Amino acid sequence: MDKFQGYLEFDGVRQQSFLYPLFFREYIYVLAYDHGLNRLNRNRSIFLENTDYDKKYSSLIVKRLILRMYEQNRLIIPTKDLNQNSFLGHTSLFYYQMISVLFAVIVEIPFSLRLGSSFQGKQLKKSYNLQSIHSIFPFLEDKLAHFNYVLDVLIPYPIHLEILVQTLRYRVKDASSLHXFRFCLYEYCNWKNFYKKKKPILNPRFFLFLYNSHVCEYESIFFFLRKRSSHLRSTSYEVLFERILFYGKIQHFLKVFVNNFPAILGLLKDPFIHYVRYHGRCILATKDTPLLMNKWKYYFVNLWQCYFSVWFQSHKVNINKLSKDNLEFLGYLSSLRLNPLVVRSQMLENSFLIDNVRIKLDSKIPISSIIGSLAKDKFCNVLGHPISKATWTDSSDSDILNRFVRICRNISHYYSGSSKKKNLYRIKYILRLCCVKTLARKHKSTVRAFLKRLGSGLLEEFLTGEDQVLSLIFPRSYYASKRLYRVRIWYLDILYLNDLVNHE
């Protein structure tokens, strides 16, 4: 990290909070398009999650862009001239895209250095496993079984660009950088309006940074409120003076009544709360009463509306009781299941039965939503009946088969943690029969005649890797029994979800 700071000459810049001069350094562009910062902080930074941006780099283009940045009047061009004006063979839109990517990289630097310093002296073992989507499910299976309620929160987005600028002002004190940031945002709106009839213009790295910085600011305030309100859960976080007075009373209360009223102290302990954020949602699991869950619900509403100036309605926060309601989480339907367990005990000549109930988190496959996705992409109809994929009939037989096999294995790989595999087998059946119908349609034949000509070897291609591994690990009798039907496997190599059709 020290070597990296010296290379960037960033110590003096960071002390003065001046980031704008870095826009005129050529090696910063090398860093942006060579993934240097991403390789250095691969296991540390939470802001470098997406590297799917333009990797093209040319020193000549960079020098031209820096010259244009010195000549500010030539950089600002009306929206109607974005497509016509060009500078040495490149449109102005190309340079705006470069500036937006560069801005995301430059502003990531102080966040990455600050986050890296917080991990100094700490050993993170197997941190790559924590990057997997499946890594959260074993944690929830261990924790949610002891909780009662879950808050399912839809994180709101600010509808005005100035809210994003104001949020970033708490982290970046450089006025010039904030002006460049505001310039990129408003120019993006001009691009969006100008190209609204064409393919939309996206900059994943730039907008990923905006989203992460926005959520990071919200979470920092939320965790502060969580710590400050743990002993005073019924008092609003806005009444600070009453809270300070109440803390003094708590200290006196603990000293006087600690020996006489030990049961009352349970009300003053911090509640067990677990917070998980995924995609555009977050969940808050706790073992509180319905009254306290409603208080947490309006905590979120007041936080977004009063501090972030974002209109946030209470119906976007759902209170789910785990014993009755299903929690839709990362493509799974999770709920608590009671597993009765009868234990026979014998003492001397007397024997008796003990009924125990074990609470377990049950994760199931949302078959209706998956069938809806398959029907949307023309693999089946809305009832789940397989149909031929007409748009793929122009491809070769091997290409069609490989596409279906890849989709089938990806779905089977992701939903291997389901407690019941019946719905997974139904999805496999839909994809297999859709593949056969597509090939039969291409060869202008019926499904029966096509299978009779090729034999059953075609369907063996859909045998997933985990099926092959389990058949080697477990005995044949166990593999053929229903016990393997309940085997749950969580993989720690799933870092993102692929598109159903377009992923290659």
From Swiss-Prot:
GO terms for biological process: mRNA processing; RNA splicing; tRNA processing. The keyword S-adenosyl-L-methionine does not apply. Keywords: Chloroplast, mRNA processing, Plastid, RNA-binding, tRNA processing. Its main location: plastid. It is found in: Plastid, Chloroplast. One of its GO terms (molecular function) is RNA binding. GO terms for cellular component: chloroplast. The keyword Nucleotide-binding does not apply. Belongs to the intron maturase 2 family. MatK subfamily. Usually encoded in the trnK tRNA gene intron. Probably assists in splicing its own and other chloroplast group II introns. This is Maturase K.
